Amino acid sequence: MVLLSFSRYCDTITMDYEENSIEGTSGYVEPITPMISKGDSGIIAISPLCDHYNNHMRIDSLTTCSDEEIIESLYQNIFSIVLCLQTEESGYGSHTPVSAACPGAPMKLTKLSRNIDPGFQRKLF
């Protein structure tokens, strides 16, 4: 990897372009990420996606929240975290209990009761 200061970066591209160019054609220069000089701090080029998140995460000093709003927000955040943790834990190790053995089928009586009239028994059975 080649580390260059920002001012040397422009000179290097021009030099590479002149070395690689043939008369009548443009030369291909491999892209090089410029590095910051010693006096600068930070990164020269940040991804647009990073800028998007940085802009959304900035805290505006003009906007103030009351104590009640802060406590309510804190309560809702903690509540949602606890709720998520409970739903995650409830899925682990929970099994439907095995039911007890089912009772047997009822047994058919083998003997008829002697108190029933025989004519009535013929109609029933």
UniProtKB/Swiss-Prot annotation:
Keywords: Cell cycle, Protein kinase inhibitor
Protein name: Cyclin-dependent protein kinase inhibitor SMR16
Biological source species: Arabidopsis thaliana (Mouse-ear cress)
PANTHER family noted in UniProt: CYCLIN-DEPENDENT PROTEIN KINASE INHIBITOR SMR11, CYCLIN-DEPENDENT PROTEIN KINASE INHIBITOR SMR16
Function summary: Probable cyclin-dependent protein kinase (CDK) inhibitor that functions as a repressor of mitosis in the endoreduplication cell cycle.
Molecular function terms from GO: protein kinase inhibitor activity
